[in-house]
Structure formats: C-alpha cells, structure tokens
A protein has these predicted regions:
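Short intrinsically disordered terminal tails
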Residues: 1-10, 27, 99-140
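Generic preference for well-ordered secondary structure
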Residues: 2, 14, 59-62, 67, ...
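Aromatic-glycine hotspot motif
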Residues: 2-51, 91
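Exposed alpha-helical structural elements
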Residues: 6, 10, 14-17, 70-74, ...
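Amphipathic alpha-helical oligomerization segments
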Residues: 17-32, 78-113
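Compositionally biased, intrinsically disordered low-complexity segments enriched
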Residues: 33-37, 61, 99
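Residues in flexible loops and secondary-structure boundaries
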Residues: 38-40, 64, 91, 101-102, ...
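A short, structured beta-strand/loop element
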Residues: 41-82, 88, 106
Length: 140
C-alpha cells in the first residue's frame, strides 16, 4: 500500500464516518435559543430544531446547554444538513482529483504526456485530507 493509497483510504473512511454521524443526528434545520442573562437555566443558549426549542442541546437541568451563545451558533452552523452537503462536495473533488498512473487526473489535464502532470495525491487532495484531520503522522 502506497502513501497515496493510505491517504485516500483514510480520507474516504473519515468521510464515511462523518456522513454516518450526520445521518444519525437530529435532522435540522437547527436554531439557537438564547436565554436571558441570569436565567435559572445556568446557560446562555440551547439548540433546537425550531425557534424556541432546545431538543438538540437542552437546558442545563436537562444535562445540556451552551455556556456561550457563540458555542450554540457554532453548533448550529455545523448541523447535519450542512455537514452532509460539505461531504458530498468533498467526495466530488476527490473523484475529480483521482490517481491516473501516479498523476492527478484533474490537475494533469492539458499536459500532453501524463508524466508531466502533478503527482498524485495533488495539493487539492492533500488539502482536503488536512481539512479532515490528516497529518503527516497518519502516514506512519
């Protein structure tokens, strides 16, 4: 197994795991419910599937709650639908930038001889993997 193969296998497995998590999560859209400062909840915000609901990240006494509104907004921005859309786009990029005899099929377009094109994995594939947590240590 080459380093290129290892990176692509790792990336596809990572995308599969993220997709499974997103598909199993509470579907959205998600909304932030901000609590009045000093409320009995002990938290600044909750996250729910409708405005005013907190069925994703509940009140403090329900074992949930976000201590900061910014955390709740971040959670909402990464709801399952958004994650699935990004995964689908990343898979399309990975399919375009595929290995073609050791060169990137997409980046190598325009080269008469493929042996002059960029090596695979190209910068696009390496950056995709980096965005999902790949480090040089993963290659060991």
């Amino acid at each position: 197994v080459t380093d290129s193969d290892r990176l692509v296998v790792w990336l596809r497995e990572t995308l599969d795991a993220a997709q499974a998590d997103a598909e199993a999560a509470t579907s959205g859209p998600w909304h932030v419910t901000e609590y009045v400062a000093g409320s009995d909840y002990g938290f600044d915000a909750g996250v729910g599937t409708a405005p005013g609901e907190v069925d994703v990240v509940g009140h403090g006494y329900e074992g949930g709650g976000c201590e900061r509104v910014q955390d709740a907004r971040h959670i909402v921005r990464h709801n399952p639908a958004n994650v699935l859309r990004r995964i689908a786009a990343d898979r399309k990029l990975l399919d375009l930038h595929r290995d073609d005899l050791g060169k990137c099929a997409e980046c190598g377009q325009g080269y008469e001889l493929m042996d002059w094109g960029p090596d695979f994995p190209c910068a696009t594939v390496r950056l995709l993997a980096e965005g999902w947590g790949w480090t040089e240590g993963e290659q060991a």
